UniProtKB/Swiss-Prot annotation:
Disruption phenotype: Hypersensitivity to copper sulfate.
Keyword NAD: no
Taxonomic source organism: Saccharomyces cerevisiae (strain ATCC 204508 / S288c) (Baker's yeast)
UniProt record similarity statement: Belongs to the protein kinase superfamily. Ser/Thr protein kinase family.
E.C. number(s) listed in UniProt: 2.7.11.1
Start and end residues of each Protein kinase domain: 173-530
Catalysed conversion reaction: L-seryl-[protein] + ATP = O-phospho-L-seryl-[protein] + ADP + H(+); L-threonyl-[protein] + ATP = O-phospho-L-threonyl-[protein] + ADP + H(+)
Domain of life (superkingdom): Eukaryota
GO CC annotation, single: nucleus
Other facts: Present with 892 molecules/cell in log phase SD medium.
List of residues binding ATP: L179, G180, N181, G182, A183, R184, G185, S186, V187, K205
Official protein name in the record: Probable serine/threonine-protein kinase IKS1
């Protein structure tokens, strides 16, 4: 199968071994499907039919062909067609209507994909959009030689005319919603369309450039970083396409005279098409769904709805925060993404929760009306995470050009902080003075440690309204106290977690960058925690007082071939712990599931036995006695205390019941 040019600038999805063809016509913006009658295979075709009828092989429908699955991958652009999502009813409807002529043209209903011609979003390769762009450019230039947009850009902006792709955005994309809006650009949820046929949903960054060469270079740096990933990554955002086009500006744009304005005139914009993550970003998820904090952007109706849901579920899930399983899933996904970035020599430099995206939405306990799902899945599952926004990334060894506040200051490593007010690159201390440090892979690891702190506590260790000078001082002086943080976690009455999470944070937040573990080491450490679990044991409480020994794990140079080259292959990857829809057959996941089921059974037994013992004590003692009061207190503690403390409270009830029985029947 291949994409080949056809008359009037059309594209044909073509396979020379079968008897059908799909034509994409940019002139009319339509898709057309042609198919040769299989019963006439032995007959002679005329020259025109032989030239135009080529095949798109389908596994079922009017005509069935037997061919390998590889025939559904275009060798020119790499785009996959999913043969399992074929609209069979549409095929049968057309078959019953007698559409079996030697060459029959089928119209495409609005907002539908013909004959199962459906693409998985991730299967759209960069070459597909490049082919579409070349075809669109050919048609646009052919029909509009006096390109008004090109003349306008030539007189006013530094970008050459031939870099613009006029009309590409409006021709092939429709905006569904606004995902985010900042001072320098916007992010939209868009659907890729050809005519009225919707082919996939993506996230699209539209960044006005104007005459700001520095800003243009920064945007191109992000594109180069994304382009350096030559294969599909499990935990890095997937980049699909980039192009330049004149469009109305959003935010501040530098004009030809160097001034800034926020006018709505058409200016050069760079469009970056990438993977759409329906779960939003990690920061919003933690604040709004995990710790139940209202967002400033939420409407009163949304807040009322959340309040009613929370009130309805009151008492069903008293603890907030994430479980150990969920924390490990998040940290491991981010560490994997960092490992892959570092393996190709890239430093992210702006790693923070808002740049970590959830592939699917996270459903909190308060949002889950299904009691079974809330009890069985909520503490074990968290959506897979990908790292996005590589606009600040740089190659290892490059000199920094800023103040040390490239991204959000709170997530910046202390060794990068330059004391005092922000300075420009022109006033940055010289390299020879050695008064500042360069970004390294360890800088990203400190950011990962601060992300760990944020997802554990739902906040950062700094006051939110600090002056920038005071904030720099706090960051420089911050030291992670493991025991103190464990006490803080207990005082906040969050879900109990494994102490090794705190030891991991301590290692990542070391002020000395040489003392921080690498992304590969963090990933291997978390995997080792899973592998060492034993069926039937308390999975996350085993070795609870032991510290993580990073020195026992071999340190590797991050700038090596990516480990994902060996075994990441499309969707056959376990990205989270555990995902119900994925085929998880690893030993660690089996152990985790066994522990979860056993632990739930034990907790229910503790509660039932405690209630029975309390009834026995009341029957054996007088009303108002100290034994009855103590039994009620212990019963309440059994229901309210963390799971790992219920056993000792239940044993205390057994002792009280024994004393009560002795007083009644012996004395």
């Amino acid at each position: 199968m291949s994409l080949v040019p056809y008359e009037e600038g059309s594209l044909i999805l073509d396979d020379p071994n079968s008897k059908s063809v799909v034509v994409v016509n940019p002139t009319s913006g339509t898709l057309s499907f042609f198919q040769q009658d299989n019963s006439n295979n032995d007959s002679e075709l005329n020259e025109d039919q032989t030239a135009s009828l080529s095949a798109l092989d389908f596994p079922s429908g009017i005509h069935q062909y037997k061919s390998p699955i590889a025939s559904y991958v275009c060798p020119q652009c790499g785009t996959e067609i999913n043969p399992d999502i074929i609209n069979r009813r549409q095929l049968h409807r057309r078959a019953s209507a007698g559409v079996e002529s030697e060459s029959s043209r089928l119209s495409i209903p609005e907002n539908t994909v013909p004959l199962g011609f459906e693409f998985a979003n991730s299967s759209f390769s960069r070459r597909y959009f490049q082919s579409l762009e070349r075809n669109h450019r050919h048609y646009a230039l052919q029909n509009d030689s006096n390109n008004k947009q090109g003349q306008f850009s030539k007189n006013k902006y530094f970008i050459p005319d031939d870099l613009f792709i006029p009309g590409y955005f409006r021709k092939f994309f429709k905006i569904l919603s606004l995902l985010g809006n900042g001072a320098r650009g916007s992010v939209y949820k868009v659907v890729h369309t050809i005519g009225n046929t919707e082919l996939g949903v993506f996230a699209l960054k539209k960044i006005p450039i104007g005459n700001d060469m520095e800003w243009f270079n920064k945007c191109i740096r992000e594109v180069k970083a994304l382009s350096s990933l030559t294969h599909k990554s499990a935990n890095l955002i997937t980049y699909n396409h980039v192009w330049l086009e004149m469009d109305s500006s959003v935010g501040f744009v530098r004009s030809i005279d160097g001034s800034q304005s926020d006018s709505q005139e058409e200016v050069p914009c760079i469009f970056i098409l990438q993977q759409y993550c329906s779960g939003g970003n990690l920061e919003d998820c933690i604040l709004r769904k995990v710790f139940n904090r209202f967002s400033d952007t939420e409407s009163p109706e949304e807040r009322k709805k959340k309040f009613r849901t929370r009130k309805k579920n009151h008492g069903k899930s008293g603890e907030v925060g994430l479980s150990t399983e969920q924390l490990v899933s998040i940290i491991r996904d981010i560490a994997r993404g960092l490992h892959e970035l570092h393996s190709i020599g890239l430093i992210h430099r702006d790693l923070k929760p808002s740049n970590c995206l959830l592939l699917t939405p996270f459903k909190s306990d308060n949002e889950n009306d299904n009691v079974y799902d809330r009890e069985h899945n909520s503490d074990e599952f968290f959506p897979s995470i990908v790292i996005g926004d590589l606009g600040e990334s740089q190659l290892e060894g490059e000199s920094r050009l800023g103040t040390g506040c490239t991204g959000t200051l709170e997530f910046t490593a202390p060794d990068l902080i330059i004391q005092g007010r922000p300075v420009s690159s022109s006033t940055l201390p010289s390299r020879s003075s050695h008064t500042y440090n360069e970004y390294t892979f360890a800088s990203d690891m400190y950011s990962l440690g601060m992300i760990c702190y944020f997802i554990v506590f739902g906040e950062l260790p700094f006051e939110p309204q600090l002056d920038i000078v005071d904030l720099k001082v706090r960051i420089k002086n911050f030291r992670f106290d493991t025991e103190g943080m464990i006490e803080k976690h207990q005082a906040m009455k969050l879900k109990p977690i494994d102490r090794r999470i705190f030891h991991l944070m301590d290692a990542l937040l070391q002020p000395n960058n040489d003392a921080r573990p690498t992304a590969k080491t963090v990933e291997e450490t978390l995997d080792e925690m899973l592998i060492n679990s034993k069926p039937g044991k308390k999975f996350w409480k085993e070795n609870v007082d032991s510290t993580l020994n990073f020195s026992t794990i071999s340190e590797v140079n991050e700038n090596t071939n990516s480990f994902t080259d060996d075994y990441i292959d499309g969707d056959n990857v376990t990205l989270s712990l555990p995902a119900p829809e994925e085929n998880l057959s690893t030993v660690s996941t089996q152990n985790l599931q066994k522990y979860s089921a056993l632990n739930r059974t034990i907790q229910v037994c503790y509660k039932l036995v405690s209630m029975i013992l309390t009834i026995i004590i009341f029957k054996c003692t007088k009303t108002g006695s100290w034994l009855s009061y103590m039994s009620l207190i212990l019963l309440g503690m059994v229901f309210k205390s963390p799971a790992d403390e219920r056993g000792k409270h239940a044993r205390a009830l057994v002792l009280l019941a024994f004393i009560a029985a002795c007083k009644k029947y012996i004395y």
